[in-house]
Amino acid sequence: MTMHRSSIGQTLAPSLAVSCWVQGEPIDLSQLLGHVVLLEVFQVNCPGCFLYSLPQAVDLHYRYGDQGLVVIGIATAFEDFDKNTLENLRSLIDSGRVIGETLRMLSEHQQLQNGRWPVRLPFPIAMDHLIPADNKVTPDAVESFIQQKLPDFTSQPIAQQNRIREQTTAYLANLQYYAETFERFALKGTPSQILIDKQGILRYSRFGYDSELEHDIQDLLNESVS
């Protein structure tokens, strides 16, 4: 999987915007000062989330939970809104039922037992808050979206910039919802991992499976709180 990492480390993490907590008690990030927080952002219809990122998050939860790591799962939706639903999230949590491309890929990789995903997610899980999109696409909205998602946009060839504008315009015109937590953290896709330090500072955001995630968690756990 392609992985994009960014180090931030200057501002407090924004608050979570969720429609409901499907597993565990409601959590406010301000309650977790003194802990290192891993936000594992996924979609139900995201094969890579289930093949790589979610199993990694489960492993980290078990190995570092007693050292001060708190893992929170955020199910989001920025596409495939008929599949990335609260109902399908509940079915996943309750019975391991998977759907769509996730079902197909897990089956191909022989990761299912009796047609179900056998991995139990042991940490709190919430559904991102979805806001209906108005689909009024303006040039300013297109440029703002591109700059947020593609910081190197202006370095692209002009022909590529024009193609990106056309694709973005079509995407926004057909967008059904905005996922509020996904947008607050300026994420680029799923799976995404967000690391927040003991002082509530947003330290890292990365898109795709990241083999360095454990090392970064260890570093944050070892930091002293000033």
Describe each region flagged by the PLM:
Residues 2-5, 111-113, 179-183:
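Short, P/G- and charge-enriched loop/turn segments at secondary-structure junctions
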Residues 52-142, 155-156:
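Structural microenvironment flanking redox-active thiols in thiol-disulfide oxidoreductases
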Residues 1-30, 162-170:
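N-terminal "domain-start" segment that seeds a small globular fold
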Residues 144-226:
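Thiol-/selenol-based redox modules, centered on thioredoxin-like
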